C-alpha cells in the first residue's frame, strides 16, 4: 500500500503490485488487506520530509506521528481481521537513553530527551506496545538505525544531507560526541524479510560501526568529495534547535548482537569508513 500515485509507480518499477490507499480510511485499508489475505504485514508507515533539515523535521512531526499512530492502528486492526499471523513494524534504534556502552533492546529509550526526540520516542513506544501486546498476532519491532544508501538522506549522489555537507551547511556541533548507529537500506530490507520468520520481539537493526558525529561526519564529507565540515559551538547551534544539539552531543549507539543471533543478520561496513579512519582508533564507538 502507498498513499500516492508516485509511490505506486515506484512500487511497480520494482516489480511489486501496489494499491493507493488513504491510511486514515479504515474501511479502505481493511478492504485492501482483506483482498490479499496476507500471512504477514510489514508496517513501514512514515510521513517524513523529502529533504532533511531540522526545520522540515519539526514541521513534519505531527503528521508523521498521526500516520504512524492512527494509520498504523488501522493497518494493524485490518491485519488481525484478515487473519494475518505476524506483524512487523518500524521503530527506532538511535533514540536510546543515556548509559555506558552500546544499548541493547532491554535498555530504555530517551523519554526525557529534547522535545522532538522525546516526542518521537513516545510515538515509537506506543507503536511497540500495540504491536507486541497483541494476543492473536505475533509482533516484531525493528529498531532501525539511520538509513544510508540509494534514495536516503545520505545517498552519496542525491541525498539532502549529502548536499548540505558539500555546501558546508551540516556542522559538527560542540563535542560531537553523539553516537550514530547507521544501516544500509538494503541490509535493513534483508533484516526485515528475516523478521517474517524470526522469534517475535524487538531487534536493533544497525551496523557494526556506531560512530561519534565528530568521526563519521568528516569521514562522510571526504567520501562524497566535500570539504571538511565546519565546527560550531553549542551556543552557536541554538538556532538549529534543541533536537539538533541532542543528536550531535547525546545520541547513544545501539548493539546489533541480538539481531545477528536471531535474524541471521549480516551487514556491510559503513561505505565511507576508510582504512585510515578505523586505524586511527576513532571508531567504532563503544560508548554514548
Give residue spans per PLM region.
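Conserved C-terminal active-site "lid" loop/helix of NAD(P)H-dependent oxidoreductases
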Residues: 185, 214-218, 238-266
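Alpha-helical substrate-binding/gating segment
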Residues: 162-171, 175-210
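Glycine/proline-rich active-site loop of Rossmann-fold NAD(P)-dependent oxidoreductases
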Residues: 100, 137, 148-160, 186, ...
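Conserved beta-loop-beta element that borders a ligand/cofactor-binding pocket
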Residues: 86, 91-92, 126-151
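NAD(P)H-binding glycine-rich loop region in Rossmannoid oxidoreductase-like domains
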Residues: 3-12, 16-70
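Amphipathic terminal alpha-helices
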Residues: 239, 269-288
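Mid/C-terminal beta-alpha module of Rossmann-like enzyme folds, strongest
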Residues: 189-244, 284-288
